[in-house]
């Protein structure tokens, strides 16, 4: 049996739209084995127990590339990453499927080939790269080649995810974005993305609040998330380092100093006054990324 663990990811980190992403210690686990025949799923809803399941789609893509034909598969899923909340659940399924398929087939593909294949299936390197490699990454696609660099994050920082009880599909969140942007808005984000990386590198945490600002995606998507601005304002009052929309949302991610012991309790009290239910979850950066059979890929 192959066991794969993949972390959740939070993409964009404010100004770093479609390029920055970070892995956090919330995980999906996949247990896969080859059987005599058939396709058996465990741990997911009945509507996902078929060949359209994203994990199986990713596995088949890998098998086809390698030229391996399993006689049958049993796929067990233990999921801790909420779906359609902006925490990289799709990326986790794709990475988990491809890595487990490659392992079943004898480990034919190398790390670069696995990564390129995962981005081809999932389409979002800002989620796939940190899920695969761990830590924070800056990613681009250049002539269909996936290129990334790990971002050094100074010690002393943690995250807090505010996860609502409602979902928001990536497709819907993409649909509200403009077809074009002003030149000045592009410059606004480029500068702040550079500032974010530098601030995290050097431990200049007081600069993060400026680097979280953007003009490319968050304001457009905020209208899809009830009470986004009031929650953001409350987080800022509680001395957060920065607040941003996690991926396409609706989860709101907060950056905090590691020694901050009061934020979670205080923001939870505020969220309880709102219409929707919100889960408050403190998180750390996952530095390992995807692990297969207890070893880093």
Curated annotation (Swiss-Prot):
Entry's Gene Ontology cellular component terms: cytoplasm
One Pfam family in the UniProt entry: GHMP_kinases_N
Predominant localisation class: cytoplasm
Binding site for ATP: 82-92
Localization per record: Cytoplasm
Pathway: Amino-acid biosynthesis; L-threonine biosynthesis; L-threonine from L-aspartate: step 4/5
InterPro entries: GHMP_kinase_C_dom, GHMP_kinase_C_sf, GHMP_kinase_N_dom, GHMP_knse_ATP-bd_CS, Homoserine_kinase, Ribosomal_Su5_D2-typ_SF, Ribsml_uS5_D2-typ_fold_subgr
EC number: 2.7.1.39
Keyword match Transmembrane: no
Function noted in UniProt: Catalyzes the ATP-dependent phosphorylation of L-homoserine to L-homoserine phosphate.
Name listed for the protein in its UniProt record: Homoserine kinase
């Amino acid at each position: 049996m192959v066991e794969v663990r993949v972390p959740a990811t939070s993409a964009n980190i404010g100004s770093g739209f479609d390029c920055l992403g970070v892995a956090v210690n919330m995980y999906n686990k996949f247990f896969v084995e080859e059987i005599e025949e058939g396709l058996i799923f465990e741990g997911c809803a009945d509507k996902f127990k078929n060949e359209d399941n994203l994990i199986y789609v990713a596995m088949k893509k890998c098998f086809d590339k390698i030229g391996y034909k399993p006689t049958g598969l049993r796929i067990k899923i233990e999921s801790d990453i909420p779906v359609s909340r902006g925490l990289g659940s799709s990326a986790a399924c794709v990475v988990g499927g491809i890595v487990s398929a490659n392992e079943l087939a004898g480990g034919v593909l190398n790390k670069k080939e696995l990564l390129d294949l995962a981005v081809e299936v999932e389409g979002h390197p800002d989620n796939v790269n940190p899920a695969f490699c761990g830590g924070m990454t800056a990613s681009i696609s250049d002539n269909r080649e996936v290129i990334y660099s790990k971002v050094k994050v100074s010690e002393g920082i943690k995250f807090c995810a505010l996860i609502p009880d409602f979902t928001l599909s990536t497709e819907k969140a993409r649909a509200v974005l403009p077809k074009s942007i002003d030149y000045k808005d592009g410059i606004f984000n480029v500068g702040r993305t550079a500032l974010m990386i530098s601030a995290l590198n050097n431990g200049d945490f007081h600069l993060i609040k400026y680097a979280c600002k953007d003009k490319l995606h968050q304001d457009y998507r905020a209208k899809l998330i009830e009470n986004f601005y009031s929650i953001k304002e409350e987080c800022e009052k509680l001395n957060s380092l920065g607040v941003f929309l996690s991926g396409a949302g609706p989860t709101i991610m907060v950056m905090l100093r590691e020694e901050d012991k009061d934020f979670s309790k205080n923001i939870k009290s505020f969220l309880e006054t709102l219409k929707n239910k919100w889960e408050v979850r403190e998180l750390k950066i996952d530095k390992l990324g995807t692990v297969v059979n207890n070893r880093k890929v």
